[in-house]
Regions:
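Active-site anion/phosphate-binding pocket segments in diverse small-molecule metabolic enzymes
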Residues: 2-20, 24, 69-70, 89, ...
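Active-site-proximal beta-alpha core segment in soluble small-molecule metabolic enzymes
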Residues: 3-6, 10-13, 18-21, 31-209, ...
Length: 398
């Protein structure tokens, strides 16, 4: 529902100026190489409709999603850039791929044959990018297992009716790891990818477009594969567009976090010594303690693992530890050190000056920033800001 108003309960502020800044930083690092902006998982929880608009305005060459539904959402929103589906598409939807000019990943001969037959029944041609598995071990033609067979299958795909091969790509498994063994593994993946490209070219099926770099790849190896192939190349950044480094080992410090998660204080009360708060009575006051209840919980994406002092929330510029267990829809913080806190005051769950960052939360909960961002649920409105002004709100409930 398009609007610029929303209920101040819990919301995610999306800084589109930061998003633009990040895109430009990646573009500069890539040396002018075309960029395929990854907007899967609703732009890592930020909202793909608005984020894709910004990327298009900034000169993105492609958009990448995970599934057909995500691609159709973008088309329905008026996005006209080429779209690549990185994952699986049921062959029965070939007509949608054709009609909406959406490119599918092709990762096995049986999948390609099924898609070919469906495309013929639909009376059109599906554009495909061949997916090479150089060591990720997910979908893709298994080059490490049997290179010659994988190439033969790719070449057979190129002859199937109803399909048009327009690209070749792969995905690095450990480009974000600086361990010597993993650095060598990334190099092996890259060389195997180049070998596959050259084999296809030698057989008369040179891919018109080639892409292999993810976020870590484009920052560490911006000349891959453009320095080694004659085809058009592009980079495929993801997490760095949203302001986060690929890993603790690979950090650049050039990006601005785009999301800030906020809520409000619903009640303030004083706990006396011996009184407790939340389920399980995991926190019992030893001294008089002022407690603020906040309008958010793990159902919104604030991890329950941040219970009992692990999470730090910002209220009036003061860091406030979480008290007791995080509930489904509410959590409590210690605001004893916060002067004049009252109901309706804003609290920053992550992304503030003294609150946790999404990366802090990832470390504390033994995960990655990607999961923290994607975990913000759909009942949390996304509030889009440009130049400090709200320009749009996406609320999936209203």
């Amino acid at each position: 529902m398009p609007t610029t108003t929303f209920e101040k309960h819990v919301w995610a502020e999306i800084d589109l100026d930061a998003l633009r800044s990040n895109f430009r930083a990646v573009k500069e690092r890539a040396g002018g190489l075309p960029l395929c902006a990854v907007v899967k998982a609703d732009s890592y929880g930020h909202g793909a409709v608005q984020c894709s608009r910004v990327f298009a305005e900034e000169g993105a060459a492609w958009l990448a999603v995970s599934c057909l539904a995500e691609a159709l959402q973008l088309r329905n929103a008026g996005r006209t850039l080429p779209i690549l589906i990185l994952g699986h598409v049921e062959p029965e939807y070939a007509s949608a791929l054709i009609e909406q000019h959406i490119t599918a990943a092709c990762y096995s001969l049986p999948q390609a044959k099924a898609l070919s037959a469906a495309a013929e029944r639909a009376g059109g041609t599906v554009d495909i990018h061949l997916k090479a598995d150089t060591g990720m071990g997910r979908i893709g033609f298994a080059l490490r297992t049997d290179f010659d067979r994988a190439i033969a299958e790719m070449l057979e795909v190129c002859t199937l009716p109803g399909l048009r091969m327009t690209g070749l790509f792969q995905h690095f498994a450990v480009a974000d790891d600086t361990d010597a063994g993993n650095v060598a593994y990334t190099e092996e993946q890259y060389q195997l990818f180049l070998r596959a490209y050259r084999a296809l070219k030698a057989a008369g099926q040179e891919p018109p477009l080639v892409h292999c770099d993810n976020s870590a790849g484009v920052m560490l190896h911006p000349d891959w594969p453009s320095s080694a192939v004659s085809a058009l190349c592009m980079a495929r950044p993801g997490i760095i567009l949203y302001g986060f480094d690929p890993s603790d080992e690979v950090r650049f410090g050039k990006f601005r976090p785009v999301m800030k998660l906020k809520t409000v204080v619903s009640m303030v009360k004083e706990l006396q010594p011996g009184q407790s708060t939340s389920y399980g009575r995991r926190f019992t006051a030893e001294t008089p303690t002022r407690v603020a209840t906040l309008c958010t919980g793990y159902a919104d994406g604030y991890p329950r693992l941040l219970s009992c002092g692990k999470g730090i929330v910002e209220v009036h510029g003061v860091p406030c530890p979480v008290l007791g267990r995080v509930c489904m829809d509410q959590l409590m913080v210690d605001v004893t050190a916060v002067p004049d806190v009252q109901e309706g005051d804003e609290a920053i769950l992550w992304g503030g000056t003294v609150s946790d960052s999404a990366e802090d939360i990832a470390r504390k909960t033994d995960t990655i920033s990607y999961e923290v961002l994607c975990g913000v649920s759909r009942r949390v409105p996304r509030v889009y800001l440009e130049h400090g002004r709200i320009i749009a709100v996406e609320d999936w409930i209203l």
